[in-house]
């Protein structure tokens, strides 16, 4: 075991800095977003935290925010990421595709993690992009690599409505403050914007136009929202000047064109540019323990190679630890630490309150409208139905690269509800590992029941009512990875106001924090959670720095 003293060196990368500037990720007023170029200057300013050390576990949305803000505060910070870096190659071969997966698709697995048409295919074991956690009652999808979930998410960054937010989040999280400060900051840093009108009019985006027509058929109103996409790159795709990705429905396995504004293209380069942050890929945290008599931690890590072989064990000592390994892994590490007695002050809420964000995925086939097979995406708008008999509901369209043989009459939609159903991440002494438990079967789940009901209602109002009852019949069986059997948006496990404070400080510790989706209360209020995770992490880091300045 090696005791590692962190002495991060600056990693200014001219190309990434110039790209950040070109994206307009510049400095705003005090407390607002700071882009890569100005971040290097901000990181040089001494604060009361200067010279302190921190470990950030994970490099997704929350971890990237923590890394940047710690670096700017002068904290010598090490970011531990179990996955590899994924630099986008100009030849378009960085990532595999949905219909032709290989080892790059999955985190050391024998089969691809998503897409039922390829799930039985054999692949080489490799530190690939997606880790599918097989739970008891639900599976959960997590992105792995420098950039975490931002590498694999669908690039949806909607902001929840105020009334839905108030239903889910505790009153201590002020929506007005998020709306005024932290949502705009997150949007600026991530480079989010709605689907532009010229792309919506493009033939490749007929699926998006069909979705807007279906919303009108239903009697709803489309709510256009932001996506974490560089639309100029998508225009280059359509012009044939860069490899096609979002223009043909790709994205979950990464964007070969570089159109996805994942955090390895904004927050993380800015963090490295402060000179205080070092990112260590292929470093997996296996244990966190308090140091007796000290207000510090030891973080035990194994460094692996791309075959999965362990090359080295390390123990890092830090003044502060920020957990951002994804809701399952953050919760699993802490639940394990509690069970093994390496973190003795954790409370009984650790691992509890895990929700699937109210997600209910459906496919609609043989539609009466042409949607295209390789659908330009990633989306366009969300529809709300506040008059739904089973309670308010939202529904979005997710562009997909359906096989050409399937024709252009298919559509994937995500229905979202607000539900109290919660599972847990629990340490199992029989296996020596944490596991995901979600005791809501397909026949007993509130999310499934409401999702099925609305899917039928939507079909009646958009197909049957127009004289076409045999078209657009929804598919939602869990056996096909639809319904609520597998979530991309697992949230909770270290819930604010229970296992943690509303600022992310873990109960029982003054120097241990959670800044990822584990902190959210099992839901992000009927929208995809990436933007809210980022905004809440920004709020947490502002509070952290201010309290120690």
Q: What are these language model-derived features?
A:
Residues 171-284, 459-462, 476-487:
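Conserved redox-cofactor binding core of oxidoreductases
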Residues 281-295:
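A conserved short coil-to-beta-strand element within the FAD-binding core of flavoproteins
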Residues 1-13:
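N-terminal secretory signal peptides
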Residues 522-540:
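A conserved FAD-binding loop/helix module that cradles the flavin
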Residues 123-142, 149, 153, 172, ...:
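FAD cofactor-binding and catalytic pocket of flavoenzymes
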Residues 45-167, 173, 329, 343-366, ...:
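N-terminal glycine-rich phosphate/pyrophosphate-binding loop and immediately adjacent elements
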């Amino acid at each position: 075991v090696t005791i590692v003293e962190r002495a991060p060196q600056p990693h200014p990368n001219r190309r990434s800095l110039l790209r950040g500037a070109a994206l307009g990720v510049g400095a705003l007023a005090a407390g607002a977003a700071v882009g890569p170029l100005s971040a290097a200057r901000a990181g040089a300013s001494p604060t009361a935290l200067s010279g302190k050390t921190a470990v950030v576990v994970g490099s997704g949305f929350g971890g990237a925010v923590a890394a940047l803000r710690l670096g700017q505060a002068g904290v010598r910070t090490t970011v531990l990421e179990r996955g590899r870096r994924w630099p986008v190659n100009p030849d378009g071969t960085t990532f595999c595709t949905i219909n032709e997966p290989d080892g790059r698709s999955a985190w050391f697995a024998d089969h691809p993690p998503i897409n039922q048409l390829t799930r039985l295919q054999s692949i080489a074991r490799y530190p690939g992009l997606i880790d599918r956690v097989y739970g008891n009652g639900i599976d959960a999808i997590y992105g792995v690599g420098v950039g975490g979930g931002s590498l694999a998410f669908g690039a949806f960054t909607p902001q929840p409505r105020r009334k839905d937010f108030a239903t889910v989040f505790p009153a201590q999280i002020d929506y007005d403050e998020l709306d005024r400060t932290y949502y705009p900051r997150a949007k600026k840093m991530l480079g989010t914007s709605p689907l532009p009108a010229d792309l919506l009019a493009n033939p490749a985006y007929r699926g998006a136009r069909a979705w807007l027509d279906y919303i009108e058929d239903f009697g709803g109103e489309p709510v256009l929202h932001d996506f974490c996409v560089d639309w100029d790159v998508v225009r280059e795709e359509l012009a044939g000047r860069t490899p096609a990705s979002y223009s043909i429905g790709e994205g979950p396995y990464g964007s070969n064109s570089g159109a996805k504004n994942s955090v390895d293209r904004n927050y993380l380069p800015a963090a490295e540019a402060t000179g205080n942050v070092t990112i260590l890929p292929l470093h997996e945290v296996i244990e966190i323990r308090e140091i007796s008599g000290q207000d510090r931690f030891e973080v035990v890590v194994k460094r692996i190679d791309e075959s999965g072989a362990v090359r080295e064990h390390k123990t890092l000592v830090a003044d502060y630890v920020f957990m951002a390994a994804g809701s399952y892994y953050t919760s699993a590490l802490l639940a394990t630490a509690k069970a093994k007695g390496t973190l003795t002050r954790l409370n009984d809420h650790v691992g509890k309150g895990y929700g699937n964000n109210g997600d209910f995925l459906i496919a609609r086939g043989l539609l009466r409208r042409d949607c295209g097979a390789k659908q330009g995406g990633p989306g366009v708008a969300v529809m709300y139905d506040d008059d739904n008999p089973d309670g308010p509901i939202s529904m979005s369209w997710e562009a997909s690269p359906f096989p050409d043989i399937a024709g252009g009459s298919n559509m994937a939609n995500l229905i979202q509800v607000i539900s109290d159903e919660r599972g847990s991440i629990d340490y199992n002494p029989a296996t020596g590992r944490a596991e995901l438990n979600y005791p809501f079967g397909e026949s007993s789940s509130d999310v499934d029941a409401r999702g099925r009901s609305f899917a039928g209602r939507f079909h009646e109002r958009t197909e049957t009512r127009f004289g076409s009852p045999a078209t657009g019949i929804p598919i939602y069986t869990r056996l096909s990875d639809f319904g609520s059997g597998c979530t991309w948006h697992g949230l909770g496990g270290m819930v604010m106001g229970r296992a943690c404070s509303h600022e992310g400080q873990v109960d029982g510790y003054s120097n241990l924090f959670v800044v990822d989706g584990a902190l959210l209360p099992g839901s992000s209020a009927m929208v995809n959670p990436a933007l809210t995770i980022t905004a809440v992490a920004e709020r947490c880091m502002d509070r952290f720095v201010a309290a120690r300045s």
